[in-house]
Amino acid sequence: MSLRPVVLPTSFGVQPDARHSPLNQPHHPLSNDMQTQNTSLNDVDVLISGYGPTGATLANLMGKRGYRVLVIDQESTIYDKPRAITADQEVLRIFQEFGVADEVAAASTPHPGTDYVGLQGQVIKRFYPAPPPNALGWEPSWMFVQPYLEAVLRQAVDRQPHVRSLLAHRLIGFEQDEHAVTAQIQRLSDGEPLTVRARYAIAADGASSIVRKQLAAPVEDLTFDEWWLVVDAWISGPIQLPERCVQYCRPSRPGTYIVGPGTLRRWEIKLLPHEDPAHFRDSHEAVWRILGEFTDTRSLTHCRTAVYRFHALVAHEWRHGRVFLAGDAAHQMPPFLGQGLCAGIRDASNLAWKLDAVMRGLSGDQLLDSYTVERKKHVRTVVGHAKSFGLIIGEMDVNKARERDRILEQDLRLGRAETIRQRFIPGLESGLMAQKPNGELQTGAGELFIQPWVRQGQGEWHRLDDLTGPRFVVVASSLDTLSALDPDAQAIIQAIDGRCVLVQAGTASGHESRDADCTPIFEERDGLLTQWLAAYHAVAVIARPDKYVYGIAQNAHHLRQLLLELQTALIEPAVQGDRDEHG
């Protein structure tokens, strides 16, 4: 049967919601064809295959920018059992961009920290969440129930009139040319075909990605391959359990205990070489027996059991023309740092602003190449840390475990061990950031920019991102710095749809909320930005739309130079045809 286009009823054309700040008016007017009622889904801006957290986040980020998005998934509903259980502050900050962070945070609990327990039951390693103040504006690490999180993300998608989702549909093939991707989709209930043409397609379809397989995209194996049993249970009676998460580093049976939100608890248990993973899929008795090695099961109610083969894999190339890999389709990591879901959300954030910049003609197509450059290195570093923790936990040689305990205990006792888990999450190591003449990143470039609480005049306190939005932002602590920018520098800021803001500690109260050039003047509540800039001996920072630092300026001349370099990286290589084609 030949594939034929199927027209699906939908209505695009509602502008993205205006946000609270005067800086944050919708900055991507929908093109004429997008403003037509009952637009066919056969022609969209972005097609996303996979409706898990990565795909749903990307759909929200692109929908909020006003793009026509179609997201498909072969499942008919959300998988109703917990999978990922922890995430970090950057994830909530990304969720903040499309208005669900508060809802997600309200249903989560702070991560209590983790103790690594050695052969004799002694603590050999400890991790704590980063102490206050919360530099990104959110809890450093938090516990959640994934089905609830996915429901919140999908409800947010449903509120976007220019985004549609198709459940129980499978991507069965695609082709691409210079201008678009043509995808063949099948409705699983009756085999009805659908052809969709999209300017870009994103594979967020998981570890067994159909798209990655069709691309024949090679994957790098970082040599971690272990079978683990995962058991989620609800506390249903009196029971003594640790208040903090625990890594049981015992050769006889390595395991992990995780404190979930509410009464949810998780145990991850390494299977021994002689054990058959299939046995634990089929036998509740076997699961309960092995769980009994870690806790009293009489006061627990079973929620779900899964047997996973933990991998450490990273795709070599994440961009293939107009097709991109994201989430588990691009990388898989063992769970010992709780960063698997976080990595996929970061992929979505990195990709969203770059697709937006290219489709709006603010940058050339080469910007999209930096997606692989930036995210792959970041993920490799995180996977490396997760793998190293997994090797600590999973050591099964008694003599090696005894030596491990001796070294780690000594490091902990002497203060040589890093105990803040967030410090194992790096900044960006290369990509679109300010560089030194030798190609290294300038000091501070690639870090996540902080998010202070600010207000205008005597107004309410807001997180800074809510008042600036997903765009390039020049944040300065002195009006003199911004006033010194010449017309060329100011024109660059306007050309990239950037904004300037002035943030001062305790000085804006009672003063005008804008200067003569209409630059917003904010007062910060906790002195966070003042301290941050002082640490770099700086007067201003350029933050990217995804909140990573492009560059930090020590003076007004340096700020102007950074803007010129940013113009070179973004605007000058832009293809005029893109501007003409996309308005």
Q: What do these predicted ranges mean?
A:
Residues 3-45, 49, 64-65, 118-121, ...:
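Helical substrate-recognition/capping region of FAD-dependent monooxygenase/halogenase enzymes
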Residues 83, 88-156, 260:
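Active-site-adjacent segment of FAD-dependent monooxygenases/related oxidoreductases
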Residues 280-343, 378, 382-385:
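FAD/FMN-dependent oxidoreductases across multiple families
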Residues 167-181:
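A conserved short coil-to-beta-strand element within the FAD-binding core of flavoproteins
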Residues 55-56:
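N-terminal Rossmann-fold NAD(P) dinucleotide-binding loop
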Residues 106, 154-156, 200, 204-310:
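Conserved FAD-binding catalytic core of PHBH/FMO-like flavoproteins
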Residues 44, 190-200:
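Core beta-strand elements of the Rossmann-like FAD/NAD(P) dinucleotide-binding domain
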Residues 63-83:
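Glycine-rich FAD pyrophosphate-binding loop
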